């Protein structure tokens, strides 16, 4: 079963999207989380919204601007560090599954930066580490919810559901595809892992079923850092495909309540990953 992560009604929540093997950005968000753990006496949480793995293998001279800041894929080391961090902070470090992780445990294999990114990463890891990675990924839930009204998915909230039980009962394994595009026909799992947009009415029905008011997700790249869609949806780009100056993460008050995504304010809930590089329009210190 896919499962749902239920966050508490107290503390701070740091939200990071789409690292895709960028270890430098992972280390930066972890340092932010650790600072909040110290400031709150341990009442902080860190949530990754999927796609921690599968980055580019491109030389600097061939790097295109549309991929944002240059980096080299370090998916294996990133996942090892995530596992150690989660073990050191039980019930405080979380991740939900993204479409790139899903490929390792039954989903279609992605081919963004290689003919088969699943095969490439697993060949680099070797048999033992591959078995370890698959076991880790099978533990990840499909969605996360919080009493503050936030519902977290990897892709857009485009699953047309009537109850939270439909998400809880969704299967991530045992799927068979004649073509990778067949995933779009899989109820619940297909749209929540692959959709880049959701019609307003579908998003509202999804949020009602999940008991939330706002949907927070990544998956798509927003070069400006984030995009609000109506009152219910916000797409956040913390890492992949974005230059350092525009990378943002979220800092939420789990004891609060967010009625619309416009309750998420730049410089408060919406924060720059690298403040010294970010413009003031994103809450940064640069001119």
Range-by-range predicted roles:
Residues 111-129, 134-210, 243:
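Active-site-proximal loop/helix segment associated with metal-binding centers of metalloenzymes
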């Amino acid at each position: 079963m896919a499962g749902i992560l239920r966050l508490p009604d107290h503390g701070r929540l740091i939200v990071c999207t789409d690292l895709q093997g960028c270890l430098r950005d992972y280390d930066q968000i972890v340092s932010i989380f650790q600072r909040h753990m110290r400031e709150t006496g341990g009442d902080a949480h860190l949530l990754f919204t999927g796609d921690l793995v599968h980055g580019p293998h491109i030389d600097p001279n061939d790097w295109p601007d549309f991929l944002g800041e240059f980096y080299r894929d370090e998916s294996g080391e990133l996942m090892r560090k995530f596992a150690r961090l989660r073990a050191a902070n039980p019930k405080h470090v979380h991740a939900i599954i993204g479409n790139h992780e899903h490929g390792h445990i039954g989903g279609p294999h992605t081919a963004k930066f290689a003919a088969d990114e699943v095969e490439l990463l697993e060949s680099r890891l070797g048999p033992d580490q591959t078995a370890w990675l698959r076991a880790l990924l099978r533990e990840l839930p499909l969605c996360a919810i919080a009493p503050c009204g936030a519902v977290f998915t990897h892709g857009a909230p485009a699953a047309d559901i009537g109850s939270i039980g439909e998400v809880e009962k969704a299967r991530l394994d045992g799927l068979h595809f004649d073509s990778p595009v067949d995933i779009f026909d899989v109820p619940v799992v297909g749209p929540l892992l692959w959709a880049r947009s959701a019609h307003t009415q579908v998003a509202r029905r999804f949020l009602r079923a999940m008991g939330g008011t706002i949907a927070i997700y990544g998956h798509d790249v927003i070069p400006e850092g984030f995009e609000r869609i109506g009152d219910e949806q916000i797409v956040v780009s913390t890492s992949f495909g974005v230059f350092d100056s525009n990378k943002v993460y979220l800092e939420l008050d789990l004891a609060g309540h967010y009625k619309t995504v416009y309750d998420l304010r730049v410089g408060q809930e919406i924060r720059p990953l690298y403040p010294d590089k970010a413009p003031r329009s994103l809450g940064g210190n640069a001119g």
